[in-house]
């Protein structure tokens, strides 16, 4: 099976680079599946788990906190606001962040405070979902 080059980068650093058979990630309008030869595309991505099926049939998971995706026929670049490899995700921190966001939503002050709390809640929930997905694949 032919492969596609996958680069996952955050605003701080390169997170992951590999030859892969398949990539799945949360696009703005739904889940995207990418194989070599995919139609070129640039789109936003939502917070969630990027699943990379490597050329050696091993899988790698990376949590992204949103960002952009560029697809070329032989290359995929994920430019994430924040990216964390699956094995580096901290469940306790995500649970605590979700709890703080829930409390902030209940004790909201301004509309801005509510929007920020909702955003933090969505991010923590996406991290917990990514952790659950990562555990199922172990």
UniProtKB/Swiss-Prot annotation:
Disulfide bonds: none
UniProt key word Cell inner membrane: yes
GO function terms (MF aspect): ATP binding; proton-transporting ATP synthase activity, rotational mechanism
Organism, as annotated: Polynucleobacter necessarius subsp. necessarius (strain STIR1)
Assembly notes: F-type ATPases have 2 components, CF(1) - the catalytic core - and CF(0) - the membrane proton channel. CF(1) has five subunits: alpha(3), beta(3), gamma(1), delta(1), epsilon(1). CF(0) has three main subunits: a, b and c.
Topology with respect to the bilayer: Peripheral membrane protein
An annotated GO cellular component: plasma membrane
Function description: Produces ATP from ADP in the presence of a proton gradient across the membrane.
Compartmental location: Cell inner membrane
This protein's name: ATP synthase epsilon chain
């Amino acid at each position: 099976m032919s492969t596609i080059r996958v680069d996952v980068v955050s605003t701080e650093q390169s997170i992951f680079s590999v030859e892969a058979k398949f990539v799945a990630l949360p696009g703005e309008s739904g889940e995207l599946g990418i194989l070599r030869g995919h139609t070129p595309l640039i789109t936003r991505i939502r917070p969630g788990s990027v699943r990379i099926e490597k050329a050696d049939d091993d899988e790698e998971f990376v949590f992204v906190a949103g960002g952009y995706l560029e697809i070329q026929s032989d290359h995929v670049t994920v430019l994430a606001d924040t990216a964390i490899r699956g094995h580096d995700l901290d469940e306790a921190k995500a649970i605590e962040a979700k709890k703080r966001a829930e409390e902030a939503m209940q004790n909201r002050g301004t509309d801005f405070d509510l929007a920020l709390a909702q955003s933090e809640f969505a991010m923590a929930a996406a991290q917990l979902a990514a952790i659950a997905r990562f555990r199922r694949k172990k």
